[in-house]
Amino acid sequence: MLAGAVLEKSSEKVVLRPAVDAVFALLDGRPVLFSETRQNIYQLDQLGAFIWCKLAEGASLATVYRELGELDIVEHAARRFTWQAIDAWTDQGLLDVDWQISASCAFSAILGRHRISVRADNRELLQRLASLFCILDNEDGENDIAIEAMLLDDRVFFRGIDGGVHRCEIEALAPTVKAYLTERLIRSDRSGFALHAASLANCGTGLLLCGQPGAGKSTLTLQLVDAGFQYAGDDVALIGDDGAVCGFPFALTLKEGSWELLSLLHSSWDGVTHCRADGAQVRYLPIRNTHIGSLSASWIIFLNRVASGTAELVSLDQLDSMKRLIDGAFAADGRLSQAGFFALKRIVAGARSFQLTYSQSGEARALLVDLCNDKA
């Protein structure tokens, strides 16, 4: 009977149990797991088989640790072995983690066209997740996306749009959920595609800052927001078939190199530090002057950050701009469609394109402010 392992956590119950499509078997006396969904066989060692069978019997984690101790495995090693197995099985979809969270530890947020419900089993997790969003909205209303997060030992588990369970360290919760939501929102928009671009508005018209991670999109976005631009997103922008641009207005993500500028522009702000999967330490700054809805791009800026030198704008023709945009585009199915190509063509035809070479974000800010105010 696959009852699951139950661990009492304050007023909630956390249940670890084999996934419904995962089965345990012996082949030539060797323990294996078969996943019907993934169509794969996973071989277990004897210790892994012991832990799996105990969880399948409904043993608590405390019981698993204790019975491993009876096999002369010290407690810290028993915990490590058990969690190594749980982590691997969760990632492989072999183990389900289920829980119930009180609705009193929750909030709703607006992200572009979406209203997101977030619940967590403690205030620290909730605070970390709240730092992701610019617009919190706790009025009654229908949510189209739900995120739940739960802390078990030192692991955080969360579930969202796809119903699957995902895990991360507590310091990585907000960046991991942001990456998860971004990927799912891109995949849910089958008709469009996305660009690695920050998006802003100046007097109702759009500015795209294009560049791969590390090009300085977020730092320059911080500068332009301080100059009075409206914020629409700092990382990814969705492009519709009509060429309309729609950013994902998560709170502005700032890596450690931008914190000095952040403290100068927002001296009273004191945010939580988070750790991304790539090891980067980041902080999130909610932007109040946020643009809601789509934009028509009037300026396309390709960022070229260098170690030193004077900031310079160089005009690009439509062909060069198109090639660069295609290099930075990605779609849900991995292909840029003909409709996507013509959407890019509409954007390029209606916008002025430039390469911005710069080393200091303040100099780049001045050039872009002049450009967007028709002074360049």
Task: Give the role of each language-model region.
Residues 1-49, 53:
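Acidic, low-complexity/disordered tracts enriched in E/D and polar residues
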Residues 14, 27, 198, 202-210, ...:
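Glycine-rich, often acidic-flanked micro-motifs
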Residues 37-113:
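Long, charge-rich, low-complexity alpha-helical segments
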Residues 135, 139-186, 361, 368-370, ...:
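Charged, amphipathic alpha-helical linker segments immediately N-terminal to NTP-binding catalytic cores
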Residues 185-202:
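Pre-Walker A adenine-sensing motif
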Residues 213-214:
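Walker A (P-loop) phosphate-binding loop of P-loop NTPases
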Residues 217:
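Conserved lysine of the Walker
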Residues 220-221:
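Post-Walker A alpha-helix
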